[in-house]
Swiss-Prot record:
Subunit architecture: Heterodimer of an alpha and a beta chain.
Task performed by this protein: This protein is one of the two subunits of integration host factor, a specific DNA-binding protein that functions in genetic recombination as well as in transcriptional and translational control.
Protein name (record): Integration host factor subunit alpha
Keyword line: DNA recombination, DNA-binding, Transcription, Transcription regulation, Translation regulation
GO molecular function terms listed in the Swiss-Prot or TrEMBL record: DNA binding; structural constituent of chromatin
Family to which the UniProt record says this protein belongs: Belongs to the bacterial histone-like protein family.
SUPFAM superfamilies (UniProt xref): IHF-like DNA-binding proteins (SSF47729)
SMART domains membership: BHL (SM00411)
InterPro entries: Hist_DNA-bd, Histone-like_DNA-bd_CS, IHF-like_DNA-bd_dom_sf, IHF_alpha
GO BP terms in the entry: DNA recombination; positive regulation of metabolic process; regulation of DNA-templated transcription; regulation of translation
GO CC terms, sorted: cytosol
Length: 110
C-alpha cells in the first residue's frame, strides 16, 4: 500500500487487514466496512471523528453566498451546505514530510 500516486481502495484496506491482523478475508472486509460506516454515521450526525496520531474529520456549515457562472459571469446564489473537512495531526504531517523526530511537535506554524 505504498508508492507515489497510488489510490488506496476499500479492497486494498481489506487486504491489508487480512495480511497484517490475521482475520479471514470476509472478516477483514466486514471490519473495514464497519469502521467506515461508524465514521460516516458520526459525520452525518455532525460529530467530529478524531483518530489519535492521524487526524480529525469534521463537518462544517457553509452559509449561503453569491458565486459566478464561469461561462457567463452571471451571479448565482450558492445554497448553504455542510462540507466534510479533514485536519491531519502534527504527527501525520511530519510523517508525510519526512520529519520523523517522533515528538509530535509541529515544525510549521499554521
Amino acid at each position: 500500500m505504498t508508492g507515489s500516486g497510488k489510490t488506496v481502495t476499500r479492497v486494498d484496506l481489506c487486504e491489508a487487514v487480512y495480511k497484517k491482523v490475521g482475520l479471514s478475508r470476509t472478516e477483514s472486509s466486514a471490519f473495514v466496512e464497519l469502521v467506515l460506516k461508524e465514521i460516516t454515521d458520526c459525520l452525518e450526525k455532525g460529530e467530529t471523528v478524531k483518530l489519535s496520531s492521524f487526524g480529525s474529520f469534521m463537518v462544517r456549515k457553509k452559509g449561503q453566498r453569491i458565486g459566478r457562472n464561469p461561462k457567463t459571469g452571471t451571479e448565482v446564489p450558492i445554497s448553504p451546505r455542510r462540507v466534510m473537512v479533514f485536519k491531519p495531526s502534527a504527527i501525520l504531517k511530519q510523517r508525510i514530510n519526512g520529519n520523523s523526530n517522533g515528538n509530535g511537535a509541529d515544525t510549521k506554524a499554521d
